[in-house]
Amino acid sequence: TLDVENTVTHRGGKLHLDPFEADNKLVMVGCLTDGNEETLFRDTFDGVQEILDEATVLIGHNIVHDLLWLWECGFKYDGAVFDTMLVEYVLQCGNKQPLSLEACANRYELATKKQDTMKEYFKNKVPIDEIPKQELADYLTADLKATQELSDVLYKKLNTKEYSGLMNTVLLTNRVAVTLARIYQNGFTVDVAKLNEVRDEFEKEKAETEKRLTKQVTKLMGDTPINLNSPEQMSWVIYSRKPRDKVEWANTFSPYMDTKEYKKQVKEKSDIVYKTDAQQCAGCLGGGQVRKVRKNGVPFINTNRCDACNGSGYHFVPSTLVAGLKFSAPTAKWISANGFTVNKTNLLTLQGIARKNELHDAVSFLTDLQRLSALDTYLSSFVEGIITHTKPDGKLHVRLLQHRTATGRFSGADPNMQNMPRGGTFPVKKVFVSRWDGGKVLEADFAQLEFRVSAYLSQDGVAIEEVTTGFDVHSYTSKVITDAGQPTSRQDAKAHTFAPLYGATGFGRTKAEAEYYTHFTEKYQGIKSWHGRLAKEVISTGKITTPSGRQFVFPDVRRNAFGKVSHFTQIKNYPVQSFATADIVPLILIQIENELSILKSCIVNSVHDSIVIDVHPDEIQKVIHVIKIVNSSMIRLIETEFNIKFNVPLLLESKIGDNWLDTKDVI
């Protein structure tokens, strides 16, 4: 069992705990053998390598952090690992609970608890290397013992009848952890000058979008001041209603409220919003400030906010015209604390309704509102996130996590690149380049992975036939919608092709688009039947088991009076997403890393279903050959790993270029 203590850097409003910060350093390393022989290295680290050489398994809680520090400090370890954090995550079967060492120690009532002695030091931002060494050593010792005790508990749990089926998932998850640590260590080179250009483009577009929205809001709301960044005020604009009493409003609705009762309560608990006319406040003459006078008639030097107009300078007098877009939120699930939700999913639904009814102003407004939200995210999460986390070596060290999502699909941090829009047009991708002059960036992307996995899991004959013959499903989607009366390009049709797999319906779509959603379930009867079997399985057993052995529990599942099963979207999604992106993608990631181990080229990221490689200029054809080898052996590898017969073709499509965006197909 191993744990490290290191200094941290405060930069850009963030804590940086990694070894890539110039001022960060290793302070202490602790090791505990299975014979409870403890060794702490404080001032010198001689002997650490000897322990690593003798280790058969390295146990840690968040082992990636420990591996990075060991590797960056020159130590070598390429053996097996057992990450207690990841093992506990797998054992939770999608029913997520806190995974910190402290939380795990308390949950399993370990004899050794994580010590509180350091919390005051951390709270006061005392540098690790300035904490008294004996106190730090005691803290490290407690962590080592707690981690070892936890590993014993988890290993015993894994060998019980209830959880033994998860052993293969645990083994794969730990193997992947080492690969993700290597990706983290490799880093992805950032062209900072290009990043600044992208930021300028986004800021210019944001200003133009805000200008259009402000003009539209004035038309919709009259003179009522509206903050475009306020979800509450956007709710007024979109739904034309305002809660009378927020506390009462929040306590009135439940997600599964009867539709008739829901509509009745909306009318009773909210008021219609009307357009207003601004009239100058007589008290402050439009200035928003007043100067009070003392009893002796002498005015005060400082002014005060005008109470009559609340400092706005105007009174907003309601007219008889209803303000806003006048949409109705269809169910109680759309309720928020301040009115109604304005999240991306619901705005897309409303946009579909507006398009269906040819409400052009509403379509324009909702399109711009979503774009403004996207631009804010691009600037804060991506541009600023990349700037903050790009290290002195000029690289963004991509941190991929296996324990954040319910399904095991990778999530990202610092920043989360998994939120990157799909497709080959996102400008931020152009800032990522090769570390070598003349080097290239190659992206290997699984073709229709989740659809193909759905075809396999359901054994839908139509889907399997289409995949096997290379049938162009996007062109087919385009044809269905076009034939229904709405000309649609293949590119635009892509947004609809697989949406029904994830629970999307024809609600809020145009009539022609809705036709495709109906057509999907009729066409893929095998997938529809499989969804029904999954629901019955969960009602009967409370859980789903995937071909890899990974499990998902649904302790609160129920069937309502109309026969519908709760959590149905998750029941449909989890098996597909987990087997595709938490099992197959990581397995192939490991294989590609093994194939690249004798080359200079290296994996630098994985986003969605893709794997990104920084390619040395002398190894372009070698890396392309690696992807071809992986393609030819992929099915055999999956069948061997999971002991299954996989009868659906899989393919990594690859493209290469001078940066991550500007690429051309090579496979």
Language-model regions, residue ranges each:
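Conserved catalytic palm subdomain of right-hand nucleotidyl-transferase polymerases, strongest
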Residues: 1, 61, 81-85, 434-450, ...
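Conserved "right-hand" nucleotidyltransferase catalytic core of DNA-directed polymerases
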Residues: 1-14, 21-24, 28-30, 107, ...
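Short active-site loop/helix that positions an aromatic residue
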Residues: 64-75, 87-92, 234-243, 447-462, ...
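Catalytic palm subdomain of template-directed nucleic-acid polymerases
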Residues: 90-94, 182-206, 454, 505-509, ...
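Polymerase palm active-site segment centered on the conserved acidic dipeptide of motif C
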Residues: 148, 197-232, 520-531, 618-667
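Conserved catalytic core of nucleic-acid polymerases
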Residues: 178, 185, 279-301, 312-315, ...
